[in-house]
Amino acid sequence: MAIKKFRPTSPALRQMTVLVSDEITCNQPEKSLLVNLKKNAGRNVHGRITVRHRGGGQKRKYRIIDFKRDKDGIPAKVATIEYDPNRTANIALLNYADGEKRYILAPVGINVGDTILSGLGADIKPGNCLALKDMPVGTIIHNIELKPGKGAQLVRSAGVSAQLMAKEGKNALLRLPSGEMRLVSINCKATIGQVGNIEHGNVVIGKAGRKRHMGIRPTVRGSVMNPNDHPHGGGEGRSPIGRPSPVTPWGKPALGYKTRKKNKASNKLIVSRRTK
C-alpha cells in the first residue's frame, strides 16, 4: 500500500495523489454477487432533492457483502481481494467448503489462500468472526453488530477499528473510533482485526473532475445565491449574511447546533460521548 505523487505538469497534478494498492489481486468481480445499482442523484420517490451535491459519476454495480457472517463452523478460503467502488474498504471473496461464495470486508493482514472461520471455536485472528462474549478483553475488532443477527452496522470504513474494553453482564463495553464508549449486547458478532486500506484517508483528490467522477457535485456558498435560494443570499456585491450567525438553507443554526434527539432510545447505552 503506497501513496503515489505526480510531477506537477498541470495545476491539478501538483497536489493530487492516488493509492497504489498491492493488496488487490483481481480486477473482475464475482458475477453472482453483483446487482444493478440505480442512480437517484439525491432525489426521493417524489423527485425532490433530499441530499444535495449528488449526481452524475461513473456507473457502478453493487457488490453484495456478507455483514451477518452466519455460516458458523464452515471454513472458507480467501480467493481474491478486490476493489469496491461503493465503499472505502477493499473486499475479499471467500470460497466456503460447501461451495458458496461470499464477499466480506478485507481486514489488515488477510492474504489470498488464508482460511477464515465464523462462530464459536474460531481463532482470534484477522478475518474471523465471533460473538463478543467469546472474545478476550482488549481485542481489536471491526464490522460490529448493534442487534444480534441483524448484521454489522458499526466500524466498517477503511482503516478503522474498535476495541473490546470490558464485558459486564449482558453487555460488552466498546471503544469506537470516534472515542465514544458504548455498550453492545455480548451476543452481537464482530470481526477480528482492523479494516484494511488504511492509507485511504491520506489520498488528496486534487481536482474537481475527480469528485465529479465519484458522483459528487459542487458545493455552492449561500452568500452567492439569490435570497429565494438561501437565507445568506441577495445584496449588492459581496454583502454580509445579515445575521448574527450562519444558518443552513432551511434557516437552522449551522454551527454548534445539536441535531441528535434528546430522548433517543440508545442514549442509555452510551457511557461517554465521542471525543472528536
UniProtKB/Swiss-Prot annotation:
Gene3D superfamilies: 2.30.30.30, Nucleic acid-binding proteins, Ribosomal protein L2, domain 3
Cellular component GO terms held in the UniProt record: large ribosomal subunit
Gene Ontology BP terms: cytoplasmic translation
Composition-biased stretches (Basic residues): 258-276
The name this protein goes by in its record: Large ribosomal subunit protein uL2
Keyword field: Ribonucleoprotein, Ribosomal protein, RNA-binding, rRNA-binding
Protein function: One of the primary rRNA binding proteins. Required for association of the 30S and 50S subunits to form the 70S ribosome, for tRNA binding and peptide bond formation. It has been suggested to have peptidyltransferase activity; this is somewhat controversial. Makes several contacts with the 16S rRNA in the 70S ribosome.
The keyword RNA-binding is assigned to this record: yes
Subunit composition and interactions: Part of the 50S ribosomal subunit. Forms a bridge to the 30S subunit in the 70S ribosome.
InterPro entries in alphabetical order: NA-bd_OB-fold, Rib_uL2_dom2, Ribosomal_uL2, Ribosomal_uL2_bac/org-type, Ribosomal_uL2_C, Ribosomal_uL2_CS, Ribosomal_uL2_dom3, Ribosomal_uL2_RNA-bd_dom
UniProt GO molecular function: rRNA binding; structural constituent of ribosome; transferase activity
Family: Belongs to the universal ribosomal protein uL2 family.
Keyword Transport: no
Stretches for region Disordered: 219-276
Organism annotation: Clostridioides difficile (strain 630) (Peptoclostridium difficile)
